[in-house]
Amino acid sequence: MSIHVVVMGVAGCGKSTVAEAIHERLGYVYAEGDDFHPQANIDKMSAGIPLTDEDRWPWLNVINSWMVAREALGENTVVSSSALKRSYREVLAKDVPTFFIHLNGSHELIQQRLSERKGHFMPPALLPSQFAILEPLVPEENGVEISIEGSVDEMVDRAIKALNAYATTVAATVAAQTATQAA
C-alpha cells in the first residue's frame, strides 16, 4: 500500500516548499496542486476573485485521480493543495490512504510571506477569504498540524517526523490485516 501526502494550508504557508522537500528527502512522487487548476480558476484568482466550491470540485477530483493513478503503480506521493475544508479533503482522500500535513501560522506572518512572493497568480488580497473558510483537521482525519514558525528545515523535519509515525502505523495495520487474512 502506498502513502499519499497532502501538504495543506492557506496560500503562502509553505505548501510547495515542504512538499518539494518531502519529495527530495523521501523520494515521494511530487505534484504541485496549482498545476491541476483549470485556466478558468487561475484567471479568476488572478483577478482577485475567490474560488467557489463549484470551482474547486473538478480540481480536487483531478488531484485525487492523479493520486489513484500513482497508487496503481505502487508509488508514494506528495501533493501541495490548499485543502481548506474538510469536504475538500474528503474528495482528495476518497480513494487512497491520505495523510494531511496542515501548515499553520499567523495571518500576519503569512501575509508577509505572500507580499514577498513573486510570480504567483494568487494575490495577497485573497488571503482573508482563505482564512475565512479554513477548517482545521479533526481527529477522524489522518493528519497533523505543523507550525510554520522557524526555519524551513525545522518545518520539514517536523513534517517528516509526523509522516514517518503515520507510515509506521500504516505498515503495522497492513501487517495485521495480512496476518488475519492468512489465518
Where do the language-model regions lie?
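Small-molecule kinase domains that catalyze NTP-dependent phosphoryl transfer to phosphate-bearing small molecules
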Residues: 117-158, 166
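Loop/turn-to-beta-strand initiation segments
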Residues: 73-77, 99
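P-loop (Walker A) phosphate-binding loop of NTP-binding proteins
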Residues: 10
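Conserved phosphate-donor/acceptor-positioning beta-strand/loop module used by diverse small-molecule
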Residues: 95-113, 146
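Conserved substrate/cofactor phosphate-moiety recognition/catalytic segment
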Residues: 13, 20-65
